[in-house]
Curated annotation (Swiss-Prot):
GO terms for biological process: monoacylglycerol catabolic process; phosphatidylserine catabolic process. Coiled coil: none annotated. The gene is ABHD16A. Its EC number is 3.1.-.-, 3.1.1.23. Phosphatidylserine (PS) lipase that mediates the hydrolysis of phosphatidylserine to generate lysophosphatidylserine (LPS). LPS constitutes a class of signaling lipids that regulates immunological and neurological processes. Has no activity towards diacylglycerol, triacylglycerol or lysophosphatidylserine lipase. Also has monoacylglycerol lipase activity, with preference for 1-(9Z,12Z-octadecadienoyl)-glycerol (1-LG) and 2-glyceryl-15-deoxy-Delta(12,14)-prostaglandin J2 (15d-PGJ(2)-G). Pfam families: ABHD16_N (PF22990), Abhydrolase_1 (PF00561). Belongs to the AB hydrolase superfamily. ABHD16 family. This is Phosphatidylserine lipase ABHD16A.
């Protein structure tokens, strides 16, 4: 009877993975058939085959879930319509509640029938036995057996806790349950006294900004967190998950962040290979509709690196909602997991981000200054210009205030706090992070990210002449035109390197540098072009084109 109840309340099972020969071992869970511990020895297909009763019940419950999601998103309009028609009176609501209660009882009955279907299936019974054993005892053998199954991630046991590192338990400088530290935006109106009256005057605007951010704004910024999109992508995500586990020998793990969100991760270990880059770990930060199952992790994987992918809060197996604070909290526990559980030193970790993932990557670079390098692909300096691009001009004040208070993705500001090597990859036909049209390459916000970065590190070089010539170089529409500008100013790379190395030897590596202070205008132009060319690579593609492995290069450093 207890097993039947477990089948009724248990998670949905999607797939049973093929085990590698090296991982086959006798089961430590009593009553485990050999056909489950060694899937190759059975006739079962690796995709879980539910019995008819479970299959049809699952379809009904999935349909109900979709209808509930549609009802949730359309509820404001529905309530407004019902109110206008007078259907929200007590005489109308009571019968409706009876109908709703009856429907819930019917769905509960369907869930019980699904449980009976699972109970009659030896595959599911064995899975639930292993899952319960793993929750009771987190032994390596139980976890190894559980990793052979792909199921609803909400039931996966937590593998790593944000407080697990001993240094955090002893130190007060780490994150609290309120979250890790973020850079806060400056007040919109400097010098204004923050009196009680002023706060009352601002209250309507603040309430409006909050409502916009938590309804329309967050879903526009992170469409991957919308349930209906995830439901549509589920087959693709399951296929990507299977590829990472079966072909790349990936290991899935659940991390618990300081805000209570559970973060879904996938680790592919290449340290046992002969390739030297396998000793380096690339932590991948996905875009606003990207998932590690089908995202940018494929690029460093093809290049031979060890890779750690993770999903934003609210994406696929990760819980929560993707606001900046939650994003940073998630990134923090991912980095801690890489260092304290996977055993990588910060000097062996590379941050690779695509698009909006630049926020979490630059936050981690700022917060963990010993990290080896940062690679930002198709990223931007600040969210405000991109948000203004897609909203009406009359909403400018509301959009700016909402972004600054609730969705402040200040990539450039965070990147300037990092001292290590950085490479920016600019998509020359990017249709997402341009503020006009893709053909107008100067409206690409990757340009602004580069300029702010160079102006922070080399303020004397990037003054007037240097800034002007770098803008000309960024405006070039082809590699030939870039080379023409580079040769027009007769950039001597050996001279540039000697100037930078001599300055570093005399003053140390800490940025910003005052190099170029006593230099001629021509010297500053040469140095500015040299530095821009070393920190930015062009990729002839649109925003969503996967980056080829040959374009995944380590950043330049002295």
């Amino acid at each position: 009877m207890a097993k039947l109840l477990s089948c009724v309340l248990g998670p949905r099972l999607y797939k049973i993975y093929r085990e590698r020969d090296s991982e086959r071992a006798p089961s430590s869970v009593p009553g485990t058939p050999t056909s489950v511990t060694n899937p190759h020895s059975s006739s079962w297909d690796t995709y879980y085959q539910p019995r008819a009763l479970e299959k049809h019940a699952d379809s009904i419950l999935a349909l109900a879930s979709v209808f509930w999601s549609i009802s949730y998103y359309s509820s404001p309009f529905a309530f407004f319509y019902l109110y206008r028609k007078g259907y929200l009176s007590l005489s109308k609501v009571v019968p409706f509640s009876h109908y709703a209660g009856t429907l819930l009882l019917l769905l509960a009955g369907v869930a019980c029938l699904r449980g009976i279907g699972r109970w009659t299936n030896p595959q599911y019974r064995q899975f639930i036995t292993i899952l319960e054993a793993t929750h009771r005892n987190h032994s390596a053998e139980n976890k190894r057996q559980l990793a052979n199954y792909n199921f609803d991630f909400r039931s996966w046991p937590v593998d790593f806790h944000w407080e697990e590192p001993s240094s955090r338990k002893e130190s007060r400088g780490g994150p609290s349950r309120r979250g890790v530290a973020l850079l806060r935006p400056e007040p919109l109106h400097r010098g204004t006294a923050d009196t009680f009256l002023n706060r009352v005057k601002k209250l309507p605007c603040q309430i409006t900004s909050y409502l916009v951010a938590h309804t329309l704004g967050r879903r526009m910024l992170y469409p991957g967190s919308v349930y209906l999109l995830q439901k549509a992508l589920m087959p693709v995500l399951l296929q990507g998950q299977a590829r990472l586990v079966e072909e790349c020998h990936g290991r899935r793990a659940k991390l618990l962040a300081c805000d209570g969100n559970e973060i879904d991760t996938m680790f592919v270990d290449r340290r046992g290979t002969a390739e030297p880059q396998g000793q380096k770990l690339v932590i991948c930060c996905e875009g606003n509709a990207g998932f590690y199952e089908v995202g940018c992790v494929s690029t460093p994987l093809e290049a031979g690196y060890s890779v750690l992918g993770w999903n934003h809060p609210g994406f696929a197996g990760s819980t929560g909602v993707p606001f900046p604070q939650n994003e940073a909290n998630a990134m923090d526990v991912v980095v801690q997991f890489a260092i304290h559980r996977l055993g990588f030193q910060p000097e062996d970790i590379i941050l690779y981000a695509w698009s909006i993932g630049g926020f979490t990557a630059t936050w981690a670079a700022m917060s963990y200054p010993d990290i080896s390098a940062v690679i930002l692909d198709a990223s931007f300096d600040d969210l405000v210009p991109l948000a203004l691009k897609v909203m009406p001009d009359s909403w400018r004040g509301l959009v700016t205030r909402t972004v600054r208070q609730h969705l402040n993705l200040n990539n450039a500001e965070q990147l300037c706090r990092y001292q290590g090597p950085v490479l920016l990859i600019r998509r020359t036909r990017d249709e997402i992070i341009t503020t006009t049209v893709p053909e107008d390459i100067m409206s690409n916000r990757g340009n602004d990210l580069l300029l702010k970065f160079l102006q922070h590190r080399y303020p004397r070089v990037m003054a007037e002449e240097g800034l002007r010539v770098v803008r000309q170089w960024l405006e070039a529409s082809s590699q030939l035109e870039e080379a023409s500008i580079y040769s027009r100013w007769e950039v001597e790379e050996d001279w540039c390197l000697s100037v930078l190395r001599s300055y570093q030897a005399e003053h140390g590596p800490e940025f910003p540098w005052s190099v170029g202070e006593d230099m001629s205008a021509d010297g500053r132009r040469q140095l500015a072009l040299f530095l821009a060319q070393k920190h930015l690579n062009n990729f002839e593609a649109t925003h969503c084109t996967p980056l080829p492995a040959q374009n995944f290069q380590m950043p330049w450093h002295l």
